[in-house]
Amino acid sequence: GASRFRVAARAVAEHPLPLEHLSRLSPRQLPERVLALDAALESHLATPAQVREFSLRARARFEKAPLWRGSPTKAVLEALGAIDERLELLELVETYRELKRRLGLVEFADQQAQAVELARSFPVVGATLRQRFRVVLLDEYQDTSSAQAILLRALFSGADTTSGRGFPVTAVGDPNQAIYGWRGAAASNILGFPTHFPRATGEP
């Protein structure tokens, strides 16, 4: 919403480093890109540090790509440019998140990530829910994000039967009706359901 955009714009303004690779973006585009990357990270429970490390490794590989007539190919140059932009955006995402902490702001994605951490760190949370509900039905499963799928697995599945493996969980969904990819939904969760929620024997 507008409030998120204002916080992101303020984070961009407060960022101390020059933005060499993002200078082509307009004052409106830059906060929008920050929010988009922040949302993508949250939906996959990835940290800026993890994506930065991956991006640097990818950059090193592209720099070693074969040359064409003594120069990098157009595709390689475009890939390097995209990586450099992402590295600067990651800096801005970190500034945005620090600003939110200073302002005491919490978004839905933050609550979602905290819920995953809670479920992973305290098995009693999942155990309590499994005692409360006899079965679980996950409707429109194609519209769940990776983070939401991880949360559900932490609550209603596990390494053994005492931690939830084999708990009666049913998912209903159609990958052809997936319409929320723009907000992190991953229709691939349907394909992974049999292994994410195996039978008590461990079989899909």
Task: Put a short name on every predicted segment.
Residues 74-192:
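Conserved helicase NTPase motor core
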Residues 1-46, 50, 188-191, 195, ...:
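Conserved P-loop NTPase-based nucleic-acid remodeling module centered on helicase motor cores
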Residues 51-84:
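Charged, glycine/proline-rich intrinsically disordered loops and linkers
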Residues 32, 47, 51, 135, ...:
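Key residue(s) within conserved catalytic/signature motifs
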Residues 43, 50, 62, 143, ...:
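Short, conserved catalytic or interaction motifs in soluble domains
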Residues 14, 40, 44, 57, ...:
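Surface-exposed polar/charged interaction patches
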Residues 166, 202-203:
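A generic structural signal for alpha->beta connector loops
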